Amino acid sequence: MRLQAVTAVAAWAVASACQSLPGTRTIWSRDADYKELSEKLSPSAKAYYPGSDEFEKANTRWSNLEVPTVNIVIVPGNENDVVETVKFANKKGLPFLAWNSAHGAMTTLGQMDSGIEIYLDQLSGVEIAEDGKTVTIAGGTKSKLVTDTLWAAGKQTVTGACECVGYIGPALGGGHGWLQGRHGTIGDQFESANIVLANGTLTSIDSSSDLWWAIKGAGHNFGIVTSVTSKTYDIEHKDWAIEILTFSGSKVVELYEAVNTHLLKNGTQPTDLINWSYWVNVPSADANNPVIQILIIQEGVNTVDSAYTTPFHSLSPITKEAHSGSYTDLAKWVGITTTDEPCQKTGAMNPRFPIYLETYNPQAQKKAFELFSDAIRGDSIFNGSLFAFDGYSTQGVRAIDEKSTAFAFRNQNVLTAPLISYMPDGPELDEKVAKLGNQLRQILHEGTGREHIPAYVNYANGDEGPEQWYGSESWRQSKLQSLKKKYDPNGMFSFYGPIA
């Protein structure tokens, strides 16, 4: 059962997509124009051209839908290499885009045409301060290295759940993670950051900078963060436990009523508790229809408290499984380690259509489940798709003034999105998927009774907009526009969640 569940999670979390370009497609001479840049780069910097294996590997993204067109990959060996590459791109009038693990799947990325990829893979490292209160993390560092390095030193911080995703990228959009109930979002941990601005200036910023507000929630729009210094914490609880329960889809209403009552508790879910759920095909559980999996995770115990699990046991799950271990086992239990399928490359399209919820509307859940099930059951080309509902604890997120950062959704309790995974087969299929994804999102939205759709920018499809990504309040939009005009007047950083 776990392996099948993990396969489903694979489609959700981080399936990869491969985009290679013809070897003849370049917009400047390798021998002439690139030489100008190469003379300014460090000896450890690298350049990959179309047609090479290195280029193909570096130019791989999570989703193959609307990918950037890259003509050369620069792999900086240090921060100054990023500076020189940005200056070179500006001089030549070339677009550029920095990426690390390349899990962002927003369709706006496809607007970068014939540009420079700044691949941060070599900028990787974790250095704990002598006093143990902070850690400096390089721009290309993956979450697993952060977690493992800190854990070995008796420390931890908030990171994303998936091991192969970068640490800094998610933080620029806020950043959800296992420990957010105690400490806030990933971005909330920042103490300072080194950032390369649109004009090629490398600067260090902290809370004294007006840009500090923006990079913690809308940071993709303002520069390339080459390193950050973040808060660390002593490990408070080494023990963790999980229980995974699989149900027939016919229980959808009862299940989400139970989640509301026994887990979410009107936004007062206990700090030590996390609840996720998936809608997914698991043939060994139901050969004909998608099922609902409820994942209940608890910190500081060897067995999840029966007060949380018993209400679900009474709903007659098809299967139950339990695991106990430490914080470093969480990714393994939910199937998102670096060796699991989510971190492998498949070439699939992987659009998501996120929406935050404060609570579940069980009837809306039923309506969405029926539509999703009809789309993915059996031999459907979408049968590897997944609908995920992430209910992290939120006390640490709510404890921080909602006006203090560009992350606008501190009062939301559930992060949800359907991931519709499929292999490329032309624009008509892409349009069909976009229609389905937005129908599913609209059902949940109508169930909330709200006017605006709050959408997590790190999961965004790209057809939303600044008000959905960064908050509908006029003061937020005005502040972002003002900072954009000041720091990036020419819109060089406008390919991911653009403000304008």
Curated annotation (Swiss-Prot):
Observed phenotype of the null mutant: Impairs the production of N-pyruvoylanthranilamide ans downstream compounds.
Cofactor(s) it depends on: FAD
Glycosylation site positions: N199, N266, N275, N383
GO molecular function list: FAD binding; oxidoreductase activity
N-terminal signal peptide: 1-20
This protein's pathway: Pigment biosynthesis
The keyword Repressor belongs to this UniProt entry's keyword annotation: no
EC numbers for this chain: 1.-.-.-
Span of domain FAD-binding PCMH-type: 65-235
Keywords: FAD, Flavoprotein, Glycoprotein, Oxidoreductase, Signal
Enzyme class: oxidoreductase
PANTHER family hit by this protein: BINDING OXIDOREDUCTASE, PUTATIVE (AFU_ORTHOLOGUE AFUA_1G17690)-RELATED (PTHR42973), FAD-BINDING PCMH-TYPE DOMAIN-CONTAINING PROTEIN-RELATED (PTHR42973:SF9)
Family statement: Belongs to the oxygen-dependent FAD-linked oxidoreductase family.
Function as written in the Swiss-Prot or TrEMBL entry: FAD-linked oxidoreductase; part of the gene cluster that mediates the biosynthesis of the yellow pigment chrysogine. the NRPS chyA mediates the condensation of anthranilic acid and alanine into the intermediate 2-(2-aminopropanamido)benzoic acid. The remainder of the pathway is highly branched yielding at least 13 chrysogine-related compounds.
Name this polypeptide is given: FAD-linked oxidoreductase chyH
Naturally occurring in which organism (per UniProt): Penicillium rubens (strain ATCC 28089 / DSM 1075 / NRRL 1951 / Wisconsin 54-1255)
Gene that specifies this protein: chyH
